[in-house]
Amino acid sequence: MLIRPNKVQKVGNLFMDTVHEEEIRLLNQLYDTLMKKDVEKADQLMDELLVDLEDHFTTEEELMREFEFFAYPMHKAEHDTMRKRFKEVYDKWKKEKNPEEVVRFLKEEFVPWLKSHVARWDSTTAQQLGD
């Protein structure tokens, strides 16, 4: 297991918390698959994660615009940074299919980013959105 669900802060918005829980489930499934070196299944999960991240970020951004969230530009900028970084990892995966590189990215970059992002930006956003 890459990350326990209770290691990512709940933000107090049911929708956002559910999205984060589902993303953690997918991340753990991908991590376990990569550790088993099941390249075919990992390839499917990388595709799924790419779509999941875009849906997650886009939906949050739409909510922020709808509620005129004051920090929308900064929050979106963090999404854009991770969109770009994950796409780089994804594209490299599609060429090389190297499980170790994706595992390193997940452990050293994505999980720390997710914890920080949720605690800093999503929790603030959730306060404005309410439940």
UniProtKB/Swiss-Prot annotation:
Transmembrane segments: none annotated. The keyword Iron applies. PROSITE patterns: HEMERYTHRINS (PS00550). InterPro entries: Bacteriohemerythrin-like (IPR023504), Haemerythrin_Fe_BS (IPR016131), Hemerythrin (IPR050669), Hemerythrin-like (IPR012312), Hemerythrin-like_sf (IPR035938), Hemerythrin_metal-bd (IPR012827). Pfam families: Hemerythrin. Fe cation 2 binds at residues 60, 75, 79, 117, 122. It comes from the Bacteria. One of its GO terms (molecular function) is iron ion binding. Keywords: Iron, Metal-binding, Oxygen transport, Transport. Fe cation 1 binds at residues 20, 23, 56, 60, 122. Monomer. Oxygen-binding protein. May be involved in a storage mechanism or for delivery to oxygen-requiring enzymes. The oxygen-binding site contains two iron atoms. Belongs to the hemerythrin family. This is Bacteriohemerythrin. The lineage of its organism: Bacteria, Pseudomonadati, Aquificota, Aquificia, Aquificales.
